[in-house]
Amino acid sequence: MSRHIPKKRFGQNFLQDAFIIHSIVAAVDARPGDVVVEIGPGLGALTRPLLRALPQLHVVEIDRDIIARLAAEFPPERLVIHEGDALAFDFGALAHEQPLKLVGNLPYNISTPLLFHLATYADRVTDMHFMLQKEVVDRMVADPGCADYGRLTVMLQYRFAMERLIDVPPESFDPPPKVDSAVVRMIPHAELPWPADDEENLSALVAQAFAQRRKTLRNNLRGWLDDDDFAALGIDPQRRPETLTLREFVLLSNRHGEKGRQ
C-alpha cells in the first residue's frame, strides 16, 4: 500500500518516536478485560502495541484512507473501527458494561473542543491518556494566578485529577508540528472536590468570567452577581478571574443559582 500523505484538514501528525510510543503504552497499562478506545489511531503507532496487550481495541477515526489501511492490517474482531468525528462520537455507547480507558494522539486543530466533549463522559471512564499541544497541557494543569489558567483549566480540574507525564519534541512526529507537545493523564475524581449545584450554570459562569481576562469579576459578572453577593462569599469583586480557585468559582455559581431560585 502506498505511503499515506498526512491531511492538514484532519490535523494529522503521526507519532513515530519509539521511546514516546513505549512511554504512552506503559502509562496506559492496558490489561485483558479493559475496554480501551483509541481516538485518531493514524498509522497505528499506538494501535499495534496496544493490541499486543489486548484481545480487542476500539478506535475512532474520521479519515477513510486510514480506515482502509487499518482494516487491511487488523481483523475486525480484534480492531473495532468506528468511522466518524470524535467531536460528535457517543463514547458512552461503548461503556454500557464497564468504564472505558481512552487514549490518543488528539488532532491539535480540535483539541480544546474535543476535551470539553470528552469531559462529559467523566463518569464512564477510568482514565484518559492524551498527546496534545504542550500549551494546552500547560493550561490543563495550571494553578490559579498564572497566565495559562483559564476556562479550560477550571472545567477540566472540576472533573479530573491531571498530571503531565512527558514532553514531546516536534521531531517525534511525521510531519513535525510547529509546536511542542506533551502527554497528559486525566483521572476522573471519585468524588468531586467541590460539587456545583448546577454544572451547566458553573460552565456558563466560568465562560462569562473569562470572557475578558483583563477585566475584574465585577465587570465580567455584571448582571450575574452584585457586590452583596461577592461580600457574602468573601470574594473581592476587584479580582481578576485567573486568581480564583475552583472552589471559589463553584461558590459563585451556587450563589447565582440560589438567586435564580428565589
Curated annotation (Swiss-Prot):
GO CC terms of this entry: cytosol
Top-level EC class as recorded in UniProt: transferase
Residue stretches in coiled coil: none
Record field: catalytic activity: adenosine(1518)/adenosine(1519) in 16S rRNA + 4 S-adenosyl-L-methionine = N(6)-dimethyladenosine(1518)/N(6)-dimethyladenosine(1519) in 16S rRNA + 4 S-adenosyl-L-homocysteine + 4 H(+)
Major place of residence: cytoplasm
Protein function: Specifically dimethylates two adjacent adenosines (A1518 and A1519) in the loop of a conserved hairpin near the 3'-end of 16S rRNA in the 30S particle. May play a critical role in biogenesis of 30S subunits.
Family: Belongs to the class I-like SAM-binding methyltransferase superfamily. rRNA adenine N(6)-methyltransferase family. RsmA subfamily.
Protein name: Ribosomal RNA small subunit methyltransferase A
Originating organism: Laribacter hongkongensis (strain HLHK9)
Organism taxonomic ancestry: Bacteria, Pseudomonadati, Pseudomonadota, Betaproteobacteria, Neisseriales
